[in-house]
Amino acid sequence: MAGTTAEYISHHLSFLASGDGFWAVHLDTLFFSLLAGVIFLFVFSRVAKNATSGVPGKLQCFVEIVIGWVDGLVKDNFHGPRNVIAPLALTIFCWVFIMNAIDLVPVDFLPQLANMFGIHYLRAVPTADISAPLGMSICVFFLILFYTVKSKGFGGLVKEYTLHPFNHWVFIPVNFILETVTLLAKPISLAFRLFGNMYAGELIFILIAVMYMADNFALQALGIPLHLVWAIFHILVITLQAFIFMMLTIVYLSIAYNKADH
């Protein structure tokens, strides 16, 4: 049983990869990330195309509520032009939420479906792969630099990382180290927070699924309510993690854009 369990868990934690080592490309992560993006674009474009000024349908009402909610958050936290930040925040929240929500699909369903087509390894949750959250966080990192330069200019960027917090040339090396660590900590923490929570959630689903393989009928039966309870709780987790990623992105960009005020 132990060996079977270990192999089962290892199989579910293996990627469909092209290449080896650092340069390996996780094809399953790419596919499901793109699929989540396509779902988001399809739903929102369909609502926009069929939008009516009369009595809206349920889907249009839901989309309008989400858009209004995100726009309100951006308005309250980003004190600058919202024409780019609001759509960016909306895209981040919806995209991350959809990628997270794939975790609610039974752990064996998609791998077994893929196995019918000769695909022996498949991990369906992109945000449980560090490469996806890290890729998004790197984009946020460059946006932070962009909005810092846009707000203060390139010279202001240099001053920010050499004359802050100690405004004296003697402390330039110290300031540079402190500010660089602070800057790099933002995308790293952003990525690992999302990855850690989603990886843990995926692993718990796998461990619950292992219970169905037990020889003890009582243990098998216990897996059903545990799976249901964890799935219900996980709905909160996937929503909260999407919100946190979006909210921290807004806050980081707001700080970068308004550094002249500090």
From Swiss-Prot:
The keyword RNA-binding does not apply. PROSITE patterns: ATPASE_A (PS00449). Pfam families: ATP-synt_A (PF00119). One of its GO terms (molecular function) is proton-transporting ATP synthase activity, rotational mechanism. Keywords: ATP synthesis, Cell inner membrane, Cell membrane, CF(0), Hydrogen ion transport, Ion transport, Membrane, Transmembrane, Transmembrane helix, Transport. It is found in: Cell inner membrane. InterPro entries: ATP_syn_F0_a_bact/chloroplast, ATP_synth_F0_asu, ATP_synth_F0_asu_AS, F0_ATP_A_sf. F-type ATPases have 2 components, CF(1) - the catalytic core - and CF(0) - the membrane proton channel. CF(1) has five subunits: alpha(3), beta(3), gamma(1), delta(1), epsilon(1). CF(0) has three main subunits: a(1), b(2) and c(9-12). The alpha and beta chains form an alternating ring which encloses part of the gamma chain. CF(1) is attached to CF(0) by a central stalk formed by the gamma and epsilon chains, while a peripheral stalk is formed by the delta and b chains. PANTHER family: ATP SYNTHASE SUBUNIT A, CHLOROPLASTIC. Key component of the proton channel; it plays a direct role in the translocation of protons across the membrane. NCBIfam families: ATP_synt_6_or_A (TIGR01131), PRK05815.1-1 (NF004477). Belongs to the ATPase A chain family. This is ATP synthase subunit a. The lineage of its organism: Bacteria, Pseudomonadati, Pseudomonadota, Gammaproteobacteria, Pasteurellales.
